[in-house]
Swiss-Prot record:
Chief subcellular location: membrane
Organism the protein comes from: Escherichia coli O7:K1 (strain IAI39 / ExPEC)
Role this protein plays: Translocates 4-amino-4-deoxy-L-arabinose-phosphoundecaprenol (alpha-L-Ara4N-phosphoundecaprenol) from the cytoplasmic to the periplasmic side of the inner membrane.
The name this protein goes by in its record: Probable 4-amino-4-deoxy-L-arabinose-phosphoundecaprenol flippase subunit ArnF
Gene transcribed to yield this protein: arnF
Membrane-spanning residues: 3-23, 33-53, 77-97, 101-121
Keyword terms: Cell inner membrane, Cell membrane, Lipid A biosynthesis, Lipid biosynthesis, Lipid metabolism, Lipopolysaccharide biosynthesis, Membrane, Transmembrane, Transmembrane helix, Transport
Regions of this protein lying in the Cytoplasmic compartment: 1-2, 54-76, 122-128
Pathway(s): Bacterial outer membrane biogenesis; lipopolysaccharide biosynthesis
BP GO annotations: lipid A biosynthetic process; lipopolysaccharide biosynthetic process
Amino acid sequence: MGLMWGLFSVIIASAAQLSLGFAASHLPPMTHLWDFIAALLAFGLDARILLLGLQGYLLSVFCWYKTLHKLALSKAYALLSMSYVLVWIASMVLPGWEGTFSLKALLGVACIMSGLMLIFLPTTKQRY
């Protein structure tokens, strides 16, 4: 059950990160404070996506709380690295994100996935 909560947390946090990235690229920069506030108060699509991303992070924290009650800390924190993989893949697949493929990034993803497999491999009981 802890693994399920952990995966929910990672998926929701990844979606929230993508939402916040979209909002940040479409809203005025915060250095233009009055334009930024006006865009938020207009509550257009960009502001709604920003709010959705923030709510996603809040929901992700709840799932993470449940994860930490059910799953060993060493395994739970390893799951967080999945977010890097999901966001990288989504940035290449989703239109408008302009994520780029590189062998260096693919090698990084392979390292992350290999590490996760090592951490989550079932342990064999040693006989003494």
